[in-house]
Structures are given as C-alpha cells and as structure tokens.
Amino acid sequence: MDRAALLGLARLCALWAALLVLFPYGAQGNWMWLGIASFGVPEKLGCANLPLNSRQKELCKRKPYLLPSIREGARLGIQECGSQFRHERWNCMITAAATTAPMGASPLFGYELSSGTKETAFIYAVMAAGLVHSVTRSCSAGNMTECSCDTTLQNGGSASEGWHWGGCSDDVQYGMWFSRKFLDFPIGNTTGKENKVLLAMNLHNNEAGRQAVAKLMSVDCRCHGVSGSCAVKTCWKTMSSFEKIGHLLKDKYENSIQISDKTKRKMRRREKDQRKIPIHKDDLLYVNKSPNYCVEDKKLGIPGTQGRECNRTSEGADGCNLLCCGRGYNTHVVRHVERCECKFIWCCYVRCRRCESMTDVHTCK
C-alpha cells in the first residue's frame, strides 16, 4: 500500500474517531470490519489507523501481537452468522456498502447493527464469542507470552477413577477477559436514555456470547497403559467447535427476551406479567421488534427476499412458502457441466468425461 493511500486511510480513521465521541454505541461494531479485511492489511496499517474506538486503539497498541487474533475472531463471527442464517429471511449478509466503501466507512451489517432487534442481539453475541474463541486458541497455540494453557488445571484429578489433568487446557478465562476489555464500552460514557438502553443491551449480549463459549467447554482425555488398557488417562479442557457455539447462540436467538426501553437500575422484561422471571446472563435480549424482512426497504438497507433461492419441498425456513413470504416462486432450469469418470492413464495424465446434468432452481418472486 503506497504512502498516499495510507494517508487517506489515516484521515478517514480520524473522522471515525470524531464519530465515536458523538455516537459511541452505534460505532461499537467498527472493529468487525477487520473480519473482511485482506490478510495482513490491519497489521500493515497499525493500530492507530484502524476503525477502532480510543480504548480499543490503546489496547491494540499495548498488545499489537493480538491483532491477528482480533481479525480472526471477527472473521469467525461473520462467517458463523452467515452460516446460521443462510436460509432465513434475514440472512446476516454483509451490506454492499461495507464491502465497497473505504475501511470501516460503512457499518458491516448496516441497519441491524444499531436497531436493537433480535438480529442485533445475535450479531453482538456471535462476534464477542468469536473474539473469545480466537484469542483463546492463540494462547493454547503458544502465540503469546502473557497467556498459554490454563495453569489452574495442571494438578489434580481423580486417582480412584484413574485420570489426572494434563496436556494443554484452553485458557478460556483469558479469552473472556480480553473480549470484555476490548468490546465493552462503559455505560456511564453515553448520553440519552435510548443510547443507554441499547448499550446495556449490547453489553449483555456480548457477555451472553462469551458465556456460550464457556458453557460448551468439554473434557478430552488420552489413554495410557500397556496395550491400550487405559489404566491412566490424561485429561484437558478444550473449547467446542465454533459451529457448535453458533448453534447454541441461534437457539438463544429463537428464545430471546424483549426488554423494556425505559432506563432503570437493571434491565426488565417488557411484559409486566413476566417481570418476576429472572433474566440470565446467557440470555439474548432485544428492545425493538424486527422489521419485515420480506420486502425491500431501501431506507433501512433491507434487501427483501425477492430473487433468493428456495427449497420447493422444504417445510422449514428455507422452503419457498416461508422464504418467499407467500408471494410464490419462479422455476428455471440450470445446466451443470462437470468432469466425471476420471481415469489415470499411464503415463502420466488423467482422462475424464464431460458430464451434463439439469437442475431445477426455484427463486422467490
């Protein structure tokens, strides 16, 4: 990247710094841009020129070796969000503006990032979880000096049951600590009742994402003994795959809780007759009901479902009836040509046939 380009990016980030002061809760998601940045670009620009708030930049400067993990955490969250919602009316697509505008100049998820809906809740939770997962993995891989394996589990076990702690347990507590330091913006720094409610909601959902990673920690063991007798086992704690964490958060999304939009000492359920039911730290919370994702809304940046591919025989969310919102669907035939019946010919090449197939593709009207 040449000097002129770097200077232009620096000026753009200075503008973002001013916006962060004016709109703190709305700018919380700028770091997510790192998840779609080209490999090596964030490291080349340096912490000062990235679309981060002042606290994040300071933490980045003190721990620059964590930048690859931050980028990987954002990538994990973005990818899993798209995977979990790929068949839904809202499919967690990155906005076109975010991919074409200069670095961080447009919110990655557009309207949903600051709408206070169930979709906002999932985005914040899965991105926070991605950061925990990525940083913890880096610790276990030995990529950082200040964290490694979970040292609290190096001793102990159960002699009577024939196992002891060993190996390298994932230090998820360090990942959670860093995620809180990097993502959680103090509520006291905001003005306006609406801002405070939305920020409190986002902070809660950040923590819900972190709790999902911790909740799905599992124990792996390796056997030791003559001829595989497993007389003694060495065990360690490890994080689940991020796909499994995504499934848990999707379930939390389906059962998310609407909270009151009025500022109180603590968040309350919106429905008065349910306020005695406690809100748990691993619940996903939202303030506003989701918009109609069936039809295009250019003002909100909602593309609608017209033209989306659907499954004619499915009764689920990907089925044409649900995805197309009752508008019906178009069917067209797609011709596929691929190599098939490949054989190795001595010596030395592979000979294949060209096989054609026709497939019906259904798209929403």
Swiss-Prot record:
Lipidation (O-palmitoleoyl serine): S227
Keywords: Developmental protein, Disulfide bond, Extracellular matrix, Glycoprotein, Lipoprotein, Secreted, Signal, Wnt signaling pathway
Signal peptide: 1-29
Any single GO CC term annotated in Swiss-Prot or TrEMBL for this entry: cytoplasm
A GO MF term: frizzled binding
Post-translational note: Palmitoleoylation is required for efficient binding to frizzled receptors. Depalmitoleoylation leads to Wnt signaling pathway inhibition.
Protein name per its UniProtKB record: Protein Wnt-16
Any one biological process term the GO annotation gives: canonical Wnt signaling pathway
Organism: Homo sapiens (Human)
Localisation: Secreted, Extracellular space, Extracellular matrix
Family: Belongs to the Wnt family.
One Pfam match: wnt
Tissue: Isoform Wnt-16b is expressed in peripheral lymphoid organs such as spleen, appendix, and lymph nodes, in kidney but not in bone marrow. Isoform Wnt-16a is expressed at significant levels only in the pancreas.
Disulfide bonds: C81-C92, C139-C147, C149-C168, C221-C235, C223-C230, C294-C325, C310-C320, C324-C364, C340-C355, C342-C352, C347-C348
Function: Ligand for members of the frizzled family of seven transmembrane receptors. Probable developmental protein. May be a signaling molecule which affects the development of discrete regions of tissues. Is likely to signal over only few cell diameters.
Main localization category: secreted
Glycosylation sites per record: N143, N189, N311
Keyword Lipoprotein attributed: yes
